[in-house]
Regions:
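Glycine/small-residue-rich loop that forms an oxyanion/phosphate-binding "nest" at active or ligand-binding sites
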Residues: 89
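Conserved small/polar residues in nucleotide/adenosyl-binding loops
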Residues: 134-141
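Boundary-proximal intrinsically disordered activation/regulatory segments immediately upstream
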Residues: 1-61
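Structural motif
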Residues: 59-63, 126-127
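Acidic/glycine-rich phosphate/pyrophosphate-binding loops and surrounding catalytic core
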Residues: 93-119
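A glycine-rich helix N-cap at a beta->alpha junction
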Residues: 79-82
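Short, aromatic/basic amphipathic alpha-helical patches
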Residues: 66-76
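Short, glycine-rich nucleotide/cofactor-binding loops
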Residues: 32-37, 122-132
Length: 142
């Protein structure tokens, strides 16, 4: 895992954390596969447990050997961008949640056939714009 010290807001490689909108992240690299930003060690750990692929980390310097150490280790050889809190806050626009962010590849969405297989009830919601916050599961009681 290369630790890369950030010295300016235009440092190469950090655009995924600050220069792209949610829509641009969804289409990053190739349509159908995009990128999302996981915030905090707990969220990153759950994403890794679910099989999501880490692409890069951004971490406050003090957390590299602290609260983010286990996440950094689990992410293998992905770059870890670091700097002081003020620079990272300016770069991202907010204080990093528990000091660490992780850019991760979005999974390929399942086909309609896969979604509907063995399903008795489907809910269709119109007008949802930010799907990253919509995690609905319908549980049917017998």
């Amino acid at each position: 895992m290369p630790i890369i010290e950030i010295s300016s807001l235009t440092h190469p490689g950090v655009d995924v954390f600050c220069m792209l909108t949610e829509a641009q992240l969804r289409q990053r690299m190739e349509p159908g596969k995009g990128v999302f930003i996981a915030e905090s060690p707990n969220v990153i750990s759950r994403a890794l447990d679910a099989g999501y692929e880490p692409l890069a980390l951004m971490c406050e310097r003090k957390h590299i050997s602290g609260s983010a150490a286990h996440i950094i280790k689990r992410c293998g050889d992905v770059p870890v961008y670091t700097g002081d809190r003020e620079l990272l806050t300016t770069l991202t626009g907010y204080v990093l949640t528990r000091g660490v962010l992780c850019a991760m590849r979005r999974p390929v969405l399942p086909s309609m056939e896969e979604i509907c297989r063995d399903t008795r009830r489907i809910v269709v919601i119109d007008g949802v714009v930010a799907v990253s916050y919509t995690h609905l599961r319908a549980h049917e009681t017998s």
